[in-house]
From Swiss-Prot:
Family membership: Belongs to the GcvP family. C-terminal subunit subfamily.
Quaternary structure note: The glycine cleavage system is composed of four proteins: P, T, L and H. In this organism, the P 'protein' is a heterodimer of two subunits.
One cellular component term from this protein's GO annotations in UniProt: glycine cleavage complex
Keyword annotations from UniProtKB, A to Z: Oxidoreductase, Pyridoxal phosphate
Name of the coding gene: gcvPB
Pfam families: Aminotran_5, GcvP2_C
Gene3D superfamilies on file: 6.20.440.10, Aspartate Aminotransferase, domain 1, Type I PLP-dependent aspartate aminotransferase-like (Major domain)
Record keyword tRNA processing present: no
Upper classification of the organism: Bacteria, Pseudomonadati, Chlorobiota, Chlorobiia, Chlorobiales
Name the record gives this protein: Probable glycine dehydrogenase (decarboxylating) subunit 2
Length: 482
């Protein structure tokens, strides 16, 4: 049965609250709030009892899918289990009750946490300095590109091109375009890595930087990264790393050691903060020595035993947020790093790589692998075999997976893989869970061959059956009158 909207449950006069009396004298609302800010008609809020509100949202939560419920295999999203200790520290009154405009002497604990987190992130990635301010990965991308632009301006360079590999996240060219750059695509080779000949042919005096993800979006490590770094820097360009896949690198290797000048982190992914449903995120940016003068203000500095916000950065590109970043995510990431330590972080990446390769080995006979293995933390399969032989598309496979109790993986991305199924199991899934997930995909491959109509009509057991995705995207109806 369809769950009704909270407004459909409303009945006039029904209440779920009671207010105690007070001794304050009554007075017209206009005496307190200027009339231009007052409504001319009453708000059409739902009138429901407390029990109805609780039951409504509990029912909705039971319909929802989340990482606390089961494996969440979205490729390039790192939907790992988020330790509850992270939420505990985030909820401590000394953090949760803060206001960003409080005097510095009353926020020393928060400033210390941010200072130490930046230092830990700097060390993890091998960079010279880190800003915590950007609110998400794409926000960090834009910040990094603006830092690159400022650097070139500071040396009198008017470079206007930015190279982006063809397997990149769509936010890479979008961020570069927002910063005013012309986007040039660099091809991949037959092994799924950057084509050095194509890169060499596109490097000229107008190229400001190359944006690269390592491991790339197919889950492959760029084995020629040192050669790429030399080519880019010999051209007077800078090297940018999208840190979306840093869950494969912790304690094993560092972007700074590969020659990257800028890297953004996705704290909500790599360092375990809940981020389904659009946020919150955090996208700190690490830079090499020559970009430090341009970092965002304010910068947290330590003077003796005191932490302060410093605005004395005349070459800074300014702010990317009104305040200092998504602080709750920073607290969670700090807790995660401190709980695991250097050895634990390395085990995170080692186990993520092991899980991805183990799961891939279970699926190879039933699905196509467009590029060679081994992979790092994720892999990209193709549903071409099922589509060509049985008329079952990757979309159908993803929908059918819902009937088996799993969230679907990322599909149709990256664009260079036909009928793409991008899967990232993360380090927090057990062998038993991976086995069950693999068996679900193997069963779907068998169904595609023997009962394709079942797969193309899926899902059939979920509370809501197959949606018209195109209509849902183009004809939004999410508003209500208040």
């Amino acid at each position: 049965m369809r769950e009704k909207l909270i407004f459909e449950l409303s009945r006039k006069g029904r209440k779920g609250y009671s207010l105690s009396g007070n001794e304050l004298p009554e007075q017209p609302l206009e005496n307190i709030i200027p009339s231009k800010y007052l409504r001319t008609t009453p708000a059409e809020l739902p009138e429901v009892a407390e029990s109805e509100v609780v039951r409504h949202f509990v029912r909705l939560s039971n319909l929802n899918y989340h990482v606390d419920k089961n494996m969440y295999p979205l490729g390039s999203c790192t939907m790992k289990y988020n330790p509850k200790i992270n939420d505990y520290t985030c909820d401590l009154p000394g953090f949760s009750a803060l206001h960003p405009l409080q005097p510095g002497e009353t926020t020393q604990g928060a400033l210390q946490l941010m200072f130490e987190l930046a230092e830990m992130l700097r060390e993890i990635a091998g960079m010279a300095a880190v800003t915590l301010q950007p609110a998400a990965g794409a926000h960090g991308e834009l910040t990094g590109i603006l830092l690159i632009k400022k650097y070139h301006e500071s040396i009198g360079s008017k470079r206007h091109k930015l190279l982006v590999v063809d397997s990149a996240h769509g936010t890479n060219p979008a961020s570069a375009a927002l910063a005013g750059y012309d986007i040039i695509s660099v091809k991949g080779n037959a092994d799924g890595r950057t084509d050095l000949d194509d890169l060499r042919s596109k490097l000229d005096g107008d190229v400001a930087a190359l944006m690269l993800t390592n491991p790339n979006t197919i889950g492959l490590f760029e084995t020629e990264i040192l050669a790429i770094s030399k080519m880019v820097h010999d051209n007077g360009s800078l090297l940018y790393m999208d840190g979306a896949n840093m869950n494969a690198l912790l304690g094993i290797t560092r972007p700074g050691d590969m020659g990257f000048d800028v890297v953004h982190y996705n704290l909500h992914k790599t360092f375990a903060a809940p981020h389904g449903g659009g946020g919150p995120g955090s996208g700190p940016v690490g830079v090499s020595e020559k970009l430090i003068p341009f970092l965002l203000v304010p910068v947290i500095v330590k003077e003796g035993t005191t932490y302060k916000l410093s605005y004395d950065r005349p070459e800074s590109i300014g702010r990317m947020m009104n305040f200092y970043g998504n602080f709750a995510v920073l607290v969670r990431a700090y807790t995660y790093i401190r709980m695991l330590g250097p050895d634990g972080l390395r085990r995170v990446s080692e186990n993520a790589i092991i899980n991805a390769n183990y799961l891939l080995s279970l699926l190879l006979e039933s699905y196509d692998l467009p590029y060679p293995k081994p992979v790092m933390h994720e892999f990209c399969l193709s549903g071409d075999r099922q589509k060509k032989a049985h008329g079952v598309k990757t979309l159908d496979i993803a929908k059918r997976l819902l009937d088996y109790g799993f969230h679907a993986p990322t599909i149709y991305f990256p664009l260079i893989v036909s009928e793409a199924l991008m899967i990232e199991p993360t380090e927090t899934e057990s062998k038993e869970t991976l086995d069950v997930f693999a068996q679900a995909l193997l069963s779907i491959a068998d169904e595609a061959a023997n009962n394709p109509a079942l797969v193309t009509s899926a899902p059939v057991t979920t509370p809501v059956k197959r949606l018209d995705d195109a209509m849902a995207s183009r004809q939004l109806n999410i508003c209500c009158s208040l």
